Amino acid sequence: MKSTFALLLVLFLFISVSAVQNAPAQARTDVYHVHFAKAALGKGAEEGDYLKKQGPNAAMPGHYIVLRHQDGEDWDYAVIEHLGTKATVDAAGNPASAAARALSAWHADTFVSGPAWPEFAHAMGLDDTAKSAGSVYVVSVYRAAPGHREELDKSLSQAPGTGDTVAGSVVMPHVEGGPWTFLSVTRYNSWQDFATGEKASVADTLKPDGGWLGVRNHATYHNDTITDRIAP
């Protein structure tokens, strides 16, 4: 009887692990607005304070994240805002005040598709902002090589390996806007976890179609920026 129970337990664990490993990728049912902003000279702090406040006409109040550049690309802030399952653009737009415009040197806007808000919020640590306050985020954009979009998507969407320190991640395909195909945001619980993950990933540099090699097999361009979160 004990041996039968042990066998069933092992079988259950095997099925459970297989189910996790073969879990489908996040369903991309919703639209998000991605805003990269470079502060005007001497206005870095003020630009951050401005971007932390979601607009009064937000489609989904409270559904956003603001990340601040620490190392990487030229932009200073990235704002990712959830718009729901559909998004519209009016001719009048949402013009910023003259004071707000004076804070920005340049900005770039792109619409992407992504998971429903609860999935996105969980991956980014927004379902418990106090607990995730020390998180580190790596924001990356990729331009797929011609005919390699699906392969790049698959490579970027691979589940973290055993012992990986990634706390959450999303891969969001371009819908309209910037000259890239995918945006990925990867979250680590701390700077220590980020450093540990970076060190461990070196051993997987030449892993077939994953990490370092996968990007170079399927993308013609990419950049990575390390950030921290300033809102919410």
Whereabouts are the PLM-identified features?
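N-terminal secretory signal peptides that target proteins for export/translocation
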Residues: 1-2
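Bacterial N-terminal signal peptides
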Residues: 6-18
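Short S/T/G/P-rich N-terminal loop/turn motif that feeds into the first structured element of a domain
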Residues: 21-232
